From Swiss-Prot:
It comes from the Eukaryota. PANTHER family: HEMOGLOBIN FAMILY MEMBER (PTHR11442), HEMOGLOBIN SUBUNIT ALPHA (PTHR11442:SF48). Keywords: Acetylation, Heme, Iron, Metal-binding, Oxygen transport, Phosphoprotein, Transport. The modification Phosphotyrosine is found at residue 24. The lineage of its organism: Eukaryota, Metazoa, Chordata, Craniata, Vertebrata. This is Hemoglobin subunit alpha. Belongs to the globin family. Heme b binds at residue 87. The modification Phosphoserine is found at residues 3, 35, 49, 102, 124, 138. The modification Phosphothreonine is found at residues 8, 108, 134, 137. Red blood cells. InterPro entries: Globin, Globin-like_sf, Globin/Proto, Hemoglobin_a-typ, Hemoglobin_oxygen_transport, Hemoglobin_pi.
Length: 141
């Protein structure tokens, strides 16, 4: 459960990300594909090379979904319901991949915003991403 401080930290972090969400999302995906090559199996139709237009487009989708979630912290299940259905029933993404992408996103954010990426912000973002992953996998059962 996100505390009031966590919610404040998450909102502040996403405000700081601003117009860089797509860029950071793509970078996190690239980092995931390089660090965890098995994740590429979910994107057989993608060019997963550095700078790929498909990776950039999907990175923007990921960032936009997370920005939407960050603006609906008190109602994540409803805010993410359609994405949960998509990932559980159509795409059938292994839930562990959400954790891998979350880790890569945290690394990306830490690289771009080291001064703002305090231990408290790191913990809040980690809890937020874990909560998002839990919601996205809630319809797998």
């Amino acid at each position: 459960v996100l505390s009031a401080a966590d919610k404040t930290n998450v909102k502040a972090a996403w405000d700081k990300i601003g117009g860089h969400g797509g860029e950071y999302g793509a970078e996190a995906l690239e980092r995931m594909f390089l660090s965890f090559p098995t994740t590429k199996t979910y994107f057989p139709h993608f060019d997963v090379s550095h700078g790929s237009a498909q990776v950039k487009a999907h990175g923007k989708k990921v960032a936009d979904a997370l920005a939407n979630a960050a603006s609906h912290l008190d109602d994540l299940p409803n805010a993410l319901s359609a994405l949960s259905d998509l990932h559980a029933h159509k795409l059938r993404v292994d839930p562990v991949n959400f954790k891998l992408l979350s880790h890569c996103l945290l690394v990306t954010l830490a690289c771009h915003h080291p001064a703002e990426f305090t231990p408290a912000v790191h913990a809040s973002l980690d809890k937020f991403l874990a909560t998002v992953a839990t919601v996205l996998t809630s319809k797998y059962r």
